[in-house]
Regions:
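All-alpha prenyltransferase/terpene-synthase fold signal
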Residues: 1-168
Length: 168
């Protein structure tokens, strides 16, 4: 009987993850868009990184007894913010600090926010997304601490980056 109960509890989580990462609006679609000549960068990143983060926030909410859809906007906002930070780090970070090669978006002709908005525009978009994420945290125990944690981790991703280092 315990096995059946665990399987029933896992079904909503499986549906959440599948809806966020599969099909025409999930990560598979986002990956396929890389082959297109023109891409809506927000839709593209929402389908990729945003979908992964939304799956995490929604699955976590469902596992904790909260309505998953109430956490979707938060996931999309922090996912897109993470992607913008990654794009900024790709042009202004160092391979030594990041532990991975830099300038890969340009070399592989991948859509990215820095190419679309410029360095300063991408940094402004990052700040807007962080504010959007803070506003999207549903009421819950630990809401303030969650906001502080998201802000701290997010800001650490872009700490020390500037348009001067991007131009170097």
């Amino acid at each position: 009987m315990a096995g059946c109960a665990r399987r029933r509890a896992a079904c909503p989580l499986t549906r959440i993850i599948a809806s966020c990462v599969g099909g025409p609006s999930g990560i598979c679609a986002g990956q396929a868009w890389e082959c297109e000549s023109e891409i809506d960068i927000v839709r593209y990143q929402r389908a990729k990184t945003g979908a992964l983060f939304a799956a995490c926030t929604m699955a976590g909410a469902a596992s904790s007894g909260y309505e998953p859809l109430g956490w979707q906007k938060l996931g999309f906002a922090i996912g897109e913010a993470f992607q913008v930070a990654d794009d900024l780090r790709d042009v202004a970070g160092s391979a030594e600090k990041l532990g991975k090669p830099v300038h890969q978006d340009e070399a592989n002709q991948r859509p990215n926010f820095v190419a679309e908005l410029g360095f300063d525009g991408a940094m402004g978009h990052f700040e807007d997304l962080l504010a959007e994420a803070m506003a999207a945290i549903p009421p819950c125990p630990g809401q303030e601490q969650l906001g502080q944690q998201i802000t701290g981790v997010s800001r650490s991703l872009v700490s020390g980056l500037s348009s001067r280092t991007a131009a170097a």
